[in-house]
Amino acid sequence: MRLVKKNVVINGIYEAGVRYPEPANISYLWNFGFFSLICLIIQLVSGILLAMHYSAHVDLAFNSIERLVREVDYGWLLRYIHANGASFFFIVVYIHMLRGLYFGSYQKPNAMLWVSGVVIFLLLIITGFLGYVLPWGQMSYWAATVITNLVTVLPVIGEDIVIWLWGGFNVDNPTLNRFFSLHYLCPFIIVGLVGLHIIFLRENGSTNPLGVKSHVDQIPFTPYFTIKDLFSFMIFLVLFFTFVFFAPNYLGHPDNYLMADSNVTPAHIVPEWYLLPFYAMLRSIPNKVLGVLALVLAIVVLAFLPFLTIAEVRSSYFRKIHKHLFWSFLALCFFLGFLGSQPAAAPYLICGLYSTIAYFIYILVLFPCIYIVEKMIIKTIMKTTVKKA
């Protein structure tokens, strides 16, 4: 113990991983932050190994991946770990964010913790899109063409930025090189932001299902939560490798097994499944500028939630109206995801437009203001009870 106390690094690890006090009543939903870190490590390691065999050239990229799968020892395993790792990364991040919404973990004094999380989420989306282009399949090529074209909505500089991104006048070899470089760089930026995220977490401590700050009902992280994390980690690995070994392409798109061809447009251009809700918002608005604005604001507006909400009671455990509101919001997000996977035609576009409006009403109006309604109802009930007494 004396050695631990003397060494700054060892003492820091000891304080963070052994003695760190956690609320005694947190559930398994609090494990998804840990899962996110595990997914980040999996993606970093598998991505670095994949980069050793990848050729960032339009004539070689597709074939280099096929060679990896067919000829490199366990290359198929590397590819499917990385591909399914991206999907599982977004699954655990979405659950992590939804848990924060449900239990009010985003509210002050955890505002900066939430904002840093939204920044990480935004960077994850960018990294996921960049990685989606690298296999240079049909869907990769056309997704890159469609999404990069959205930058043209920027006044004056939009066209110049697109030409710079493309490295020419269409998506080609310079584009692939740029995307590969950025895709390799972004995870390391995410690692830095995750470190900042953890610092903000340590500043105010973890929240709990009751949403009540307590310095009394806390227990050390080890052994209680270490065992809990290890148990849930084993379950996570079972689910993850079930997809890797038995359904490796279930979360992907079959068109990406066709080499990119600029002369053949896919019948239905779609991004990866985890971006479908935002894609539905983008294409449901007829005006291109407003569509891009809605796409960006749908993510950015989440960062303003801590500053819009003034609820004294955080957790939905005590807020029945907020609880029903949350589940209806979750259903709306699933519905947007479904709409994003459908062809760009009626009735999906009009449903997407109304769902997009509903999404912003939930975030900007209902979530911040529902506490006022709840407070009025509680006061009315209390007055009625006092009169009866």
Swiss-Prot record:
Annotated residues that bind heme b b566 are located at 96, 197
Q: Which PROSITE patterns match?
A: CYTB_CTER (PS51003), CYTB_NTER (PS51002)
Q: Where does heme b b562 bind?
A: 82, 183
| UniProt cofactor(s) | heme b
Question: InterPro entries from the entry?
Answer: Cyt_b/b6_C (IPR005798), Cyt_b/b6_C_sf (IPR036150), Cyt_b/b6_N (IPR005797), Cytb/b6-like_sf (IPR027387), Cytochrome_b (IPR030689), Cytochrome_b_C_euk/bac (IPR048260), Cytochrome_b_N_euk/bac (IPR048259), Di-haem_cyt_TM (IPR016174)
Q: Which UniProt keywords apply?
A: Electron transport, Heme, Iron, Membrane, Metal-binding, Mitochondrion, Mitochondrion inner membrane, Respiratory chain, Transmembrane, Transmembrane helix, Transport, Ubiquinone
Give GO MF terms, alphabetically: metal ion binding; ubiquinol-cytochrome-c reductase activity
Q: Name one GO biological process term.
A: mitochondrial electron transport, ubiquinol to cytochrome c
Q: Which domain of life is it from?
A: Eukaryota
Q: Where in the cell is it found?
A: Mitochondrion inner membrane
How, per the record, is the cofactor bound?
Binds 2 heme b groups non-covalently.
The entry's cellular-component GO terms read: membrane; mitochondrial inner membrane; respiratory chain complex III
How would you describe this protein's topology in the membrane? Answer: Multi-pass membrane protein
Gene3D superfamilies to which the protein is assigned, alphabetical: Cytochrome Bc1 Complex, Chain C
User: Which stretches are transmembrane?
Assistant: 32-52, 76-98, 113-133, 179-199, 225-245, 290-310, 325-345, 353-373
Q: Which residues form the signal peptide?
A: none
Q: Could you tell me what this protein does?
A: Component of the ubiquinol-cytochrome c reductase complex (complex III or cytochrome b-c1 complex) that is part of the mitochondrial respiratory chain. The b-c1 complex mediates electron transfer from ubiquinol to cytochrome c. Contributes to the generation of a proton gradient across the mitochondrial membrane that is then used for ATP synthesis.
Assembly behavior: The main subunits of complex b-c1 are: cytochrome b, cytochrome c1 and the Rieske protein.
User: Any additional notes?
Assistant: Heme 1 (or BL or b562) is low-potential and absorbs at about 562 nm, and heme 2 (or BH or b566) is high-potential and absorbs at about 566 nm.
Q: Provide the family line.
A: Belongs to the cytochrome b family.
Q: What protein name does the entry list? A: Cytochrome b
Q: Which organism is it from?
A: Dictyostelium discoideum
